[in-house]
Regions:
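Short loop/turn elements at secondary-structure junctions
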Residues: 3-9, 71-142
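Conserved short "hinge" loops at termini or chain/domain junctions
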Residues: 1-64, 117-142
Length: 142
């Protein structure tokens, strides 16, 4: 980058995305700000293009967009092997069912769901675009 070029400003959703990542127990590392900012721009551009929206995103898409940005960022960290959480234990068995009267609980213990698979499923849930949400905001382009 030359001296005349400036770094891109932080995306308006940047702070919300950082808060969301911290709520998952992710600790920010050096260099994450640029990656988060890139994910903000990437996901926002996808939504703008899919919905044919010119101008700012509708406020009702804010938290949807924050989750998609968080998922995109975590997916890139996971795929490069640079992801670790402090608060989420993917080794713990997931609860399959829970009954309150006469207290019974069963856990979803399956050999096909190892911690890495659970982590990937969690990230996919965040990152996968729910087009039913986006269809509500889609506009025709003439």
């Amino acid at each position: 980058m030359s001296q005349n070029e400036t770094l891109p400003s932080l995306h308006p959703l940047f702070n919300l995305v950082v808060s969301r990542l911290l709520s998952f127990g992710y600790q920010l590392l050096d260099g994450d700000n640029d990656k988060i900012n890139y994910s903000c721009r990437f996901v926002s551009e996808y939504i703008h293009n899919f919905c044919n929206i010119y101008g700012p995103l509708p406020k009702r898409l804010t938290f949807y967009t924050v989750d998609k940005i968080s998922g995109d960022f975590l997916k890139s960290k996971f795929m490069t092997g640079n992801l670790s959480f402090n608060d989420i234990d993917f080794n713990a068995p997931a609860v399959k069912s829970l009954t309150e009267g006469d207290a019974s609980a069963s856990f979803a213990v399956d050999s096909s769901t190892n911690p890495a698979k659970r982590c990937a499923d969690f990230i996919d849930l965040l990152a996968a675009p729910d087009k039913n949400v986006l269809y509500r905001f889609r506009r025709l382009e003439w």
